From Swiss-Prot:
One of its GO terms (molecular function) is ATP hydrolysis activity. This is Replication factor C small subunit 2. Heteromultimer composed of small subunits (RfcS) and large subunits (RfcL). The lineage of its organism: Archaea, Thermoproteota, Thermoprotei, Thermoproteales, Thermoproteaceae. Gene3D superfamilies: 1.10.8.60, 1.20.272.10, P-loop containing nucleotide triphosphate hydrolases.
Length: 319
């Protein structure tokens, strides 16, 4: 197996290689066909393809000259708006290489910038609009000031569907000589929730443990509880022997080395899948959320987990 991070090794280089995101690809292809584009704002959760799509767009626009015509910046890494201004100024003052009518600046984590810094960024975008286009990347559109939102075409990126993640993971596993079971893919998706970057990283970590990646291997590698085993334990806790379930949960922590925070997160997801009346699920979610918050505040993790499960058990017996 290559030592290179698989997420970078298998990052798509063209629109055709990008899984899912059909509507986004269709819009960006129109810009490539026209040879022109507005400023863009890509927003959505981490690992949903924002950076990848920005780089693919650069490749499609500029071909072999995409590196010369593209400047990548990270708002968190740069030392303030003045550094960004100077780097953009230096980049924009030279003509695009090849036949491109403009250069491209990709600014990641733009929502981490202060409002004042974003106001300065807005002015930079206006000053260099004649020969430079910006693609801003953000996890939360609410973190971007309205004057920038109104000057960009906003494109939303959603968590990737399970089928798209599975297809990509199977492709990578086959290329790396790794066997991965369907249960392992389910466990990875459970852990990463549609974040492709985390899913690929999770597969690579699991593959360092064994070239035959199973659900158990994934759980061990990622420091989580096997989803199947957790479901059985939760069923025992709410409908069977509570003492037996408590012993199993203690084992997850003491023997398996799984953190209480990870367990409560997994419990939250699994509890909402219980076969119970829909009106009860918000109450269950609130009980688990209270325990989660208490653990974050420093309360004893196992005590909070046991208490939450006992409350859910009583609730389900009362309905």
């Amino acid at each position: 197996m290559s030592e290179l991070f698989w997420f970078e090794k298998y990052r798509p280089r063209s629109f055709d290689e990008v899984v899912d995101l059909e509507e986004v690809k269709a819009r960006l292809r129109q810009f490539v066909k026209a040879g022109n584009m507005p400023h863009l704002l890509f927003y959505g959760p981490p690992g949903t393809g924002k950076t990848t799509m920005a780089l693919v767009l650069a490749r499609e626009l500029y071909g072999e000259y995409w590196r010369e015509n593209t400047l990548e910046l990270n708002a968190s890494d740069e030392r303030g708006i003045n550094v960004i201004r100077e780097r953009v100024k230096e980049f924009a003052r030279t003509a695009p290489v090849g036949k491109a009518p403009f250069k491209l600046v990709i600014l990641d984590e733009a929502d981490n910038m202060t409002s004042d810094a974003q106001q300065a960024l807005r002015r930079i975008m206006e000053i260099y609009a004649q020969n430079t286009r910006f693609i801003l990347l953000a996890n939360y559109v609410s973190g971007i000031i309205e004057p920038i939102q109104s000057r960009t075409v906003m494109i939303r990126f959603s968590p990737l569907p399970k089928e798209a993640v599975f297809a990509r993971l199977r492709y990578i596993a086959e290329n790396e000589g790794v066997k991965v079971s369907d249960d392992a893919l389910e466990a990875i998706y459970e852990f990463t929730q549609g974040d492709m970057r985390r899913a690929i990283n999770a597969l690579q970590i699991a593959a360092t443990v064994s070239k035959a990646v199973t659900e158990e291997v994934v759980a061990k590698a990622l420091g989580m509880v096997s989803p199947r085993l957790l479901r059985e334990t939760l069923y025992e806790a709410v409908k069977g022997s509570f003492g037996k379930a408590a012993t199993q949960i203690y084992g997850f922590v003491a023997d398996g080395g799984v953190g209480e925070l990870e367990i409560i997160k997994q419990i939250h997801r699994e509890m909402l899948r219980l076969d119970v009346q829909e009106y009860v699920k918000p109450e269950i979610a609130y009980i688990i959320a209270e325990a989660h918050y208490a653990i974050l505040r420093g309360a004893h993790g196992l005590t909070q987990i046991y208490g939450a499960l006992a409350k859910v058990r009583r609730l389900l017996k009362s309905v």
